[in-house]
């Protein structure tokens, strides 16, 4: 605890000295952040770590180049079967040895709404310092918390104003209002019945660790095979975790990778390509000049100490083809670098839109419209199209119903007309027969025997 207090005084002293930290922003505590790779990338820059970026992972099977770690966002429900099943599964892999715990950076989340920063720090502060430049703030935090307990490390994170200010600067205005409604002591990712929570997966000393600030201990998933990368082990663990945590039904989760800044690798590759381009271009010019002058002496051949290419092994046509390929590669990488710069710029634009509070503008704009007497008319115009659309849909529905009824009526009329036509045809066929019977002196439809029998009965009655 004393070391954590020292971290506060050191950071606060630097803040007061430089007047760079708006301490009033910390009055409301830590605010809730969205799960967005652009937001996390800019947050790392604000922490002082400029050589890292965060990318969203859409396909677990797709290879990822040199990741420092992964951040998994999932729906946290305190009392559900899947949660109990995960606890039962992960309890067996808890690392409870105090010496092993103190040798890594594992911090318990004791500050509400700080799980996003916890997840990033769990990845960065467990990386090899030779491969990653942490910056002044994170480097000081790592040095101060060395050997601390997980709880004190969590307190040290919450008591570092640089981290808190950077964290809150990326929160939406709705997060502050939500915090005011729920109370400053309620954590959206810890104490509510259903929320979202971040955990980190990092390789430490040849083993895959899962660091969750809401768990009492770090979790060791074991070593990976000699012939595979640590990401292969992570994929297997993640596939199993998704099946348990989501019950193969809930798809509300997010996976992000903390990777080196792509612009650094592209810039390094461009530098190498341009160097090779200059070497090949110079060699080609000297070779063409030698061909023109007819000088083929070995001592006069171009000297290329920085290339492994022997000028005598290539013709001018070969060098021209190689130069063309280099030009193509340079153009492709320049486009990639421009895309990455545009992407980083869009992160900043989205951050400005996300964090800007539009409430005052909207209220002022509506007040001006009401003062000018046009607000009611605009509202009516906005509502009128909706009514027109509803009426149009009703008319279309009624027309479709009437058309269907008319079609059914036509079908019934057609069937009746067909039956009447058949009856007329039958009557037409019977008329010649009746005419022939009349010619023979017999009444159609009457039996002669019955007629005589009836006459005899009449005579008897008389």
UniProtKB/Swiss-Prot annotation:
UniProt keywords, alphabetically: Chromatin regulator, Hydrolase, Nucleus, Protease, Thiol protease, Ubl conjugation pathway
UniProt-annotated stretches for the region Positively charged C-terminal tail required for binding nucleosomes: 387-462
Broad class of where this protein is predominantly found: nucleus
Composition skew (Basic residues), residue ranges: 448-462
Low complexity: bias regions: 413-447
Hydrolase found in the keyword field: yes
Segments of this protein annotated with the region Disordered: 413-462
GO molecular function: chromatin binding; cysteine-type deubiquitinase activity
Record's subcellular location: Nucleus
Superkingdom of this protein's organism: Eukaryota
EC number: 3.4.19.12
InterPro entries reported for this sequence: Papain-like_cys_pep_sf, Peptidase_C12_UCH, Peptidase_C12_UCH_sf, UCH_C
Record site feature (Transition state stabilizer), residues: 109
Summary of subunit composition and partner proteins: Catalytic component of the polycomb repressive deubiquitinase (PR-DUB) complex, at least composed of caly/calypso, Asx and sba (MBD5/6 homolog). The PR-DUB complex associates with nucleosomes to mediate deubiquitination of histone H2AK118ub1 substrates; the association requires the positively charged C-terminal tail of caly, probably due to direct binding of DNA. Interacts (via ULD domain) with Asx (via DEUBAD domain); the interaction produces a stable heterodimer with a composite binding site for ubiquitin.
Family indicated by similarity: Belongs to the peptidase C12 family. BAP1 subfamily.
Name the UniProt record assigns to this protein: Ubiquitin carboxyl-terminal hydrolase calypso
Native source organism of the sequence: Drosophila grimshawi
């Amino acid at each position: 605890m004393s070391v954590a207090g020292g971290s506060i005084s050191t950071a606060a002293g630097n803040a007061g000295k430089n007047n760079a930290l708006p301490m009033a922003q910390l009055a409301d505590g830590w605010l809730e952040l969205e799960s967005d790779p652009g937001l996390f990338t800019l947050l790392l820059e604000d922490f002082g770590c400029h050589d890292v970026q965060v990318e969203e992972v859409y396909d677990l099977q797709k290879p990822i180049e040199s990741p420092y770690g992964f951040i998994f966002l999932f729906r946290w429900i305190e009392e559900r079967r899947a949660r109990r099943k995960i606890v039962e599964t992960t309890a067996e892999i808890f690392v409870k040895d105090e010496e092993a715990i103190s040798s890594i950076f594992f911090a318990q989340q004791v500050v509400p709404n700080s799980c996003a920063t916890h997840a990033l720090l769990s990845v960065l502060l467990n990386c090899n310092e030779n491969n990653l430049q942490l910056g002044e703030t994170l480097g000081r935090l790592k040095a101060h918390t060395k050997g601390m307990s997980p709880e004190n490390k969590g307190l040290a994170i919450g008591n570092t104003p640089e981290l808190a200010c950077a964290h809150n600067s990326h929160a939406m205005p709705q997060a502050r209002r939500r915090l005011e409604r729920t109370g400053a002591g309620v954590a959206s990712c810890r104490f509510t019945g259903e929320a979202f929570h971040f955990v980190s997966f990092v390789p430490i000393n040849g083993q895959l660790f899962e660091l969750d600030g809401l768990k009492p201990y770090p979790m060791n998933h074991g070593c990976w095979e000699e012939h595979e990368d640590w990401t292969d082990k992570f994929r297997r663990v993640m596939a199993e975790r998704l099946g348990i945590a989501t019950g193969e039904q809930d798809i509300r989760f997010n996976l992000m990778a903390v990777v080196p800044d792509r612009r650094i690798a592209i810039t390094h590759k461009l530098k190498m390509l341009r160097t090779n381009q200059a070497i090949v271009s110079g060699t080609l010019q000297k070779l063409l000049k030698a061909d023109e002058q007819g000088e083929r002496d070995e001592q006069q051949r171009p000297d290329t100490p920085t290339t492994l290419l022997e000028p005598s092994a290539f013709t001018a046509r070969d060098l021209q083809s190689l130069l063309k390929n280099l030009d193509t590669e340079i153009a492709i990488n320049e486009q990639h670098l421009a895309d990455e710069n545009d992407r980083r710029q869009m992160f900043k634009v989205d951050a400005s839109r996300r964090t800007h509070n539009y409430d005052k503008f909207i209220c002022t704009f509506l007040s001006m419209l009401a003062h000018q007497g046009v607000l009611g008319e605009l509202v009516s115009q906005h509502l009128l199209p909706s009514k027109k659309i509803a009426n149009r849909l009703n008319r279309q529905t009624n027309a479709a119903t009437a058309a269907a009824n008319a079609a059914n009526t036509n079908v019934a009329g057609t069937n009746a007309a067909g039956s009447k036509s058949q009856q007329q045809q039958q009557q037409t066929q019977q008329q010649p027969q009746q005419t022939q019977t009349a010619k023979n002196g017999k009444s159609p439809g009457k039996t002669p025997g019955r007629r005589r029998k009836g006459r005899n009965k009449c005579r008897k009655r008389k």
